[in-house]
């Protein structure tokens, strides 16, 4: 590609096992696909379990006043999203839905669905599972990020019973590489 500007990609992992998770492994693989398409990438990983993300209280101050009164790490995490060109957001599948960490964080971004600040941002969603629910999680994540104004350009589902041992290995490797390339193409 002729454009060698630096692309900022933020990978958010919503697994409580962090760097030991399949979700992290999938995010790394998407980034590898992005780097293959464009070497000038500045990447950052955020593990939601390392941050103070309190659940929504339902007070709707974010809708009425445009900010959340809770004092935790969510505003700083939102700033990192706003500073990125592309976002990779991954969650394990728990009971056919996103993890508690993912749900708490996304609920706290409710104000973004009413004042979407992410136009011009591109997202790849990731769901890692033991075999069921990845399509449901990726569908939910696509709806949420689209409501925030972002364009979802790819989704990846990895199924593994043993960490890193993908049941659909070839498909997963293909999907992650394609998702990374598509993320770069959308940004450029």
Feature map (PLM): residue ranges:
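Conserved helix-turn-beta segment immediately C-terminal to the redox Cys motif
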Residues: 112-116
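Active-site/pore-lining binding-face segments in mid-to-C-terminal subdomains
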Residues: 143-188
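Conserved short-loop catalytic and cofactor-binding motifs
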Residues: 65, 90-93, 125, 129, ...
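N-terminal beta1-alpha1-beta2 submodule of the flavodoxin-like/Rossmannoid cofactor-binding fold
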Residues: 1-91, 96-111, 174-179, 184, ...
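Short, glycine-/small-residue-rich phosphate/pyrophosphate-handling segment
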Residues: 117-158
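A short secondary-structure junction signal
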Residues: 100, 134-139, 167-171
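Short histidine/acidic/glycine/proline-rich micro-motifs that form metal-
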Residues: 16-20, 95, 129-132, 161-163
């Amino acid at each position: 590609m002729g454009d060698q500007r630096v692309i900022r990609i933020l990978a958010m992992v919503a697994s409580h096992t962090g760097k030991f998770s399949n979700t992290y492994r999938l995010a790394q693989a998407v980034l590898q696909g992005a780097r293959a398409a464009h070497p000038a990438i500045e990447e950052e990983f955020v593990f939601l379990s390392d941050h103070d993300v309190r659940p929504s209280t339902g007070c709707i101050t974010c809708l009425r006043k445009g900010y959340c009164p809770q004092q935790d790490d969510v505003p700083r995490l939102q700033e990192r999203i706003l500073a990125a060109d592309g976002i990779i957001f991954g969650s394990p599948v728990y009971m056919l839905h996103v993890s508690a960490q993912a749900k708490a964080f996304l609920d706290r971004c409710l104000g973004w669905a009413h004042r979407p600040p992410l136009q011009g941002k591109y997202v790849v969603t990731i769901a890692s599972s033991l075999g069921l629910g990845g399509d449901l999680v990726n569908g939910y994540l696509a709806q949420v990020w689209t409501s925030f104004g972002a364009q979802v350009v790819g989704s990846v589902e990895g199924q593994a019973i043993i960490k890193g041992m993908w049941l659909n290995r070839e498909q997963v490797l293909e999907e992650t590489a394609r998702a990374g390339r598509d993320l770069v193409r959308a940004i450029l």
